[in-house]
Amino acid sequence: ILATTENVKMIYVIPDFQNPTGKTWTLERRQKFMELINKYEIPVIEDNPYGELRFEGEFLPSLKSMDTKDLVIFLGTMSKIFAPGLRIGWVCSTNAEVLGKYNFIKQGADLQSSTIDQLITNQFLEDNDLDAHVEKIKAVYVKRRDAMLKTMEETFPKEVKFTHPE
């Protein structure tokens, strides 16, 4: 598609634990994707809400960490690793033009994230080790995942296929 059209202005991807499939891109796929992105110089939004919640297997590099041309805009959120429903996230880019446009759009949408949510998050980050917290919630989530998989295996007909979330 990239070779045959000039209409592609941006690509949005979730390479880690894509919802609803739970699929994760392999390292090889990430590398090939970045080769294409660099060749055609297409901006990419990498949405990574679940990246910190890997239960098994090895962590894979983000596309942003593989980005040599500043084409990847990385999005993260506190709602999956700190508090569900919390509407605080972050944007990582060194492209000032992109960040300026994002700021403009954000202000047009809601001016700012809740001040109370920001203060709660700030206090939590000052008082706690975020990595240790993530490990605690992963222990809870992996038990829930295992219970869900067990129930699905016991209940669903064999024709039903599903992924084993990592």
Protein language model features and the residues they cover:
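Conserved core segment of the aminotransferase class I/II
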Residues: 68-139
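Active-site phosphate-binding strand-loop segment of PLP-dependent enzymes
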Residues: 1-55
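A generic "structured core" feature
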Residues: 37-40, 44, 63, 148-152
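Conserved glycine-rich beta-strand-loop-beta hairpin in the small C-terminal domain of fold type I
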Residues: 122, 139-149, 159-166
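Short, conserved active-site loop motifs that form the nucleotide-linked donor/cofactor pocket
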Residues: 42, 72, 160
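Residue-level signal for well-ordered alpha-helical positions
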Residues: 23-24, 56, 66, 102-105
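Short amphipathic alpha-helical segments and helix-helix/interface helices
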Residues: 30-34, 60-64, 99, 149
